UniProtKB/Swiss-Prot annotation:
Family designation: Belongs to the pantothenate synthetase family.
Protein name stated in the entry: Pantothenate synthetase
Gene: panC
Quaternary structure note: Homodimer.
Keyword field contains Nucleotide-binding: yes
Entry annotation: catalytic residues: H37 (proton donor)
InterPro entries listed in its UniProt record: Cyt_trans-like, Pantoate_ligase, Pantoate_ligase_C, Rossmann-like_a/b/a_fold
Remaining remarks: The reaction proceeds by a bi uni uni bi ping pong mechanism.
Organism: Salmonella paratyphi A (strain AKU_12601)
Amino acid sequence: MLIIETLPLLRQHIRRLRQEGKRVALVPTMGNLHDGHMKLVDEAKARADVVIVSIFVNPMQFDRPDDLVRYPRTLQEDCEKLNKRKVDYVFAPAVEEIYPQGLEGQTYVDVPGLSTMLEGASRPGHFRGVSTIVSKLFNLIQPDIACFGEKDFQQLALIRKMVADMSYDIEIVGVPIIRAKDGLALSSRNAYLTAEQRKIAPGLYNVMNSIAEKLIAGNRELQEIIAIAEQELNEKGFRADDIQIRDADTLLELTETSKRAVILAAAWLGQARLIDNQSVTLAQ
């Protein structure tokens, strides 16, 4: 496994891979890797000849400076995990390598609508930062496929739209959420939880299951369903942030013709903002 930190060296290897006709898969990450990331790697390995994992804590997508500062950086441990998984390349550039002129005045990629709705409404600039760094990685690495986790449901939808709108010839693969045995979605931010909070954390998944059961039963009183769910979260020790029930295919409001719904949930537990989602097939 080769660790690449500079753009010239990356370009050199990408040119060689292209000349050899290799099928390349990209797994973009911010590091602090867990089993959910390893599932992305496994999916990439099954679909390509060469797997490149990027590790870059992207300052452009953080809406709070304190969150950027305390985001876990575990490059050595991450590389050890990826080496055991027989990843071919790790691209781990410094911020100055990606943004040599700094962030101010930086050209960016924005996806209208999807970047400012739902999660984007509460985190201004976040999705613009995501789409910009992913676009830069696509331009640099020129992958045939790229793997993203379905835990970040809106992010995946945004990347799919960007790829379609910008005519990237890249297959976007969504990989299902990996959960702990108690239902908690694996996330780098789970590291912020205390031992006591970790015991409470699966409550978010349980509340989503309760919402799903109501939707499957035909209940469409969405405001009431959401209000009850927020109350349940608060009673469990969370601070409910945002719960939405949307059309899973468009992320717009549910209509009578919607075939699938997605429950999008975000809640604070101590210093950790946990997000999760669950898709539900609706009775027609």
